[in-house]
Amino acid sequence: MQGHHQNHHQHLSSSSATSSHGNFMNKDGYDIGEIDPSLFLYLDGQGHHDPPSTAPSPLHHHHTTQNLAMRPPTSTLNIFPSQPMHIEPPPSSTHNTDNTRLVPAAQPSGSTRPASDPSMDLTNHSQFHQPPQGSKSIKKEGNRKGLASSDHDIPKSSDPKTLRRLAQNREAARKSRLRKKAYVQQLESCRIKLTQLEQEIQRARSQGVFFGGSLIGGDQQQGGLPIGPGNISSEAAVFDMEYARWLEEQQRLLNELRVATQEHLSENELRMFVDTCLAHYDHLINLKAMVAKTDVFHLISGAWKTPAERCFLWMGGFRPSEIIKVIVNQIEPLTEQQIVGICGLQQSTQEAEEALSQGLEALNQSLSDSIVSDSLPPASAPLPPHLSNFMSHMSLALNKLSALEGFVLQADNLRHQTIHRLNQLLTTRQEARCLLAVAEYFHRLQALSSLWLARPRQDG
């Protein structure tokens, strides 16, 4: 019993000495437990040759042998640790700091680490290679916060007024995209038509085209002037072909507008069809402006119209005031404000028509006076003086005749303004019925002309 107590006391003293020795090694920054087991085998072999005074006790030798048996065998001798144990890692890495600060002190087993040290090494090694869980949790928490903030940005109000306003905004955005798409398609179709028209003009001027059984743009001349059917120029013939295409496109657009009106579409959707028809009419105004610069007589004569339409022709087109009378009965019921606006528009349109008619009449009278000779020259008068008098009168008449183009352009401008001002006074559905009524009016005039030309004729 006393021997056992003495051995235990000797073991504690040896442990304290070893602990102080371990602290000394910890201060130097290295741990003897990190030394390769081969070194312990070497030192153990040297211990058998030491004098008996320095030989370790049997109990110490037993613990050393047990620790060596628990360490895994290795084939290399690595007496230097992977990194100094006393170096503190940077504060940014929390998990590495915790693993480094676990500097094991010497255990009571002597100069070697206890049996629990290998498990500690394995635990630290696994913690070193294990990905940081804190950053993942922080990232997940940040994602949850981001989702919460994004959910917070989405209005979750149950107010009916707010929900209705949001629905209206979405519907308006959708209609805006549809209008933009239709506008782009219209621009593309206009570009294609313009390219085709330019190609036809070049082909008509270079090769000549057949129109109504006669050659246009070729070498047919009369008095040094190129002629076609009815003495029209090549530009006028191209305008007639383009006008025929315009009529076909107008019929297609009106059919779409009629279907849209019958389907009871919304105001925004119906507005798209109305704007398309108005833009198509503006295209005709541009075509007439181009041909007016080259052959204004073709527009005034109405050669591009049907016979029944020529009876109502006024300065190369229809009278705007007559169109207002046609559509008034087709767009009822009207409000009091609309009736007042339409009456005022009709009165101002009639005044403008009267002013243009008086101006054109004055121009015709002046033109007639310019070409009338003051007196007939005598039969014995020489030809050159008579020819010079003729050329002076023709030059004066040409200067006055150039104003005829301005009258036609002003009349087309009045027609354009009347239609657009009338549409401003009406609702979208009334505008649609207005366009359909005008188209039906001209369609009946064209049908009347066809019936007149196809009527049976009596001989004699």
UniProtKB/Swiss-Prot annotation:
Record's protein name: Transcription factor TGA10
Enumerate composition-biased segments (Basic and acidic residues).
138-162
Q: Where is the composition biased (Basic residues)?
A: 1-11
Write out the GO biological process terms: anther development; DNA-templated transcription; hydrogen peroxide mediated signaling pathway; response to molecule of bacterial origin
* S-adenosyl-L-methionine listed as a keyword: no
Gene expressing this chain: TGA10
Q: Where is this region: Basic motif?
A: 161-181
The answer to keyword Transcription applying to this record is yes
The major lineage groups are:
Eukaryota, Viridiplantae, Streptophyta, Embryophyta, Tracheophyta
Q: Can you name the source organism?
A: Arabidopsis thaliana (Mouse-ear cress)
Tell me a Gene Ontology molecular-function term this record carries. Answer: DNA-binding transcription factor activity
Q: Which family does it belong to?
A: Belongs to the bZIP family.
The entry's localization annotation reads: Nucleus
Q: In which tissues is it expressed?
A: Expressed at low levels in inflorescence apex and flowers.
The cross-references to Pfam families, in alphabetical order and at most eight, read:
bZIP_1, DOG1
**Residue ranges, compositional bias (Polar residues):** 65-81, 121-136
